[in-house]
C-alpha cells in the first residue's frame, strides 16, 4: 500500500509519535510525505520515505496528483484546525480528491489509529482492486 503522511507544523511532533508507535506496520508499506514531515520521520525512525515539496510549496498538490491517478491508497494528514494555513485551498483540494477517489483519509490521531489497525488486519485489500481500475472510479 502507498501511504501519504502529512502534518502541519504544530502537528509534526504528533506525526513522529504516531509513526514511531506504528513503525512495525508502516515499514511494510511504501511511504510518501511532504518535505519537512518526511525528513522528520526519516530522522526519527530511519524509515524510507519518498519526499515531495513542503506543503506550502506544492507538496499537498503532488500527493493530490497521485490520488487523482489512483496511485495513493491512504492519507494520514494531521491538520492544525486552529491555525490559518496559507495553502488552505490545496488542503481542501486534497481532502476533496480523497472523497472523489475513495481514498481512506485520517485528519487526526484517533482516526489514523483506526485506519492503521485496519491496515494491519488487511481491511484495505480492496484498494488493490480499485487501483487496477484507474480512471473508472466514481464513473470518471
UniProtKB/Swiss-Prot annotation:
Which keywords fit this entry according to its UniProt record?
Lyase
The residues covered by the MGS-like domain are 1-140
The answer to whether the entry has keyword Glycoprotein is: no
Q: Which domain of life is it from?
A: Bacteria
Q: What's an example of a GO molecular-function annotation for this chain? A: methylglyoxal synthase activity
Give a GO cellular-component term.
Answer: cytosol
Q: Which family does it belong to?
A: Belongs to the methylglyoxal synthase family.
The name under which this protein is listed is Methylglyoxal synthase
Organism listed in the record: Geobacillus sp. (strain WCH70)
Gene coding for it: mgsA
Amino acid at each position: 500500500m502507498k501511504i501519504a503522511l502529512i502534518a502541519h507544523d504544530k502537528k509534526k511532533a504528533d506525526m513522529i509519535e504516531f509513526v514511531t508507535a506504528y513503525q512495525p506496520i508502516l515499514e511494510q508499506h511504501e511511504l510518501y510525505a511532504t518535505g519537512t514531515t518526511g525528513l522528520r520521520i526519516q530522522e526519527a525512525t530511519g524509515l524510507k520515505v519518498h519526499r515531495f515539496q513542503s506543503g506550502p510549496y506544492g507538496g499537498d498538490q503532488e500527493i493530490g496528483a497521485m490520488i487523482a491517478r489512483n496511485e495513493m491508497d491512504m492519507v494520514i494528514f494531521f491538520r492544525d484546525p486552529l491555525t490559518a494555513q496559507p495553502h488552505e485551498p490545496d488542503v481542501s483540494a486534497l481532502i476533496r480528491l480523497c472523497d472523489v477517489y475513495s481514498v481512506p483519509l485520517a485528519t487526526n490521531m484517533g482516526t489514523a489509529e483506526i485506519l492503521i489497525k485496519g491496515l494491519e488486519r488487511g481491511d484495505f485489500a480492496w484498494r488493490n482492486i480499485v487501483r487496477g481500475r484507474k480512471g473508472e472510479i466514481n464513473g470518471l
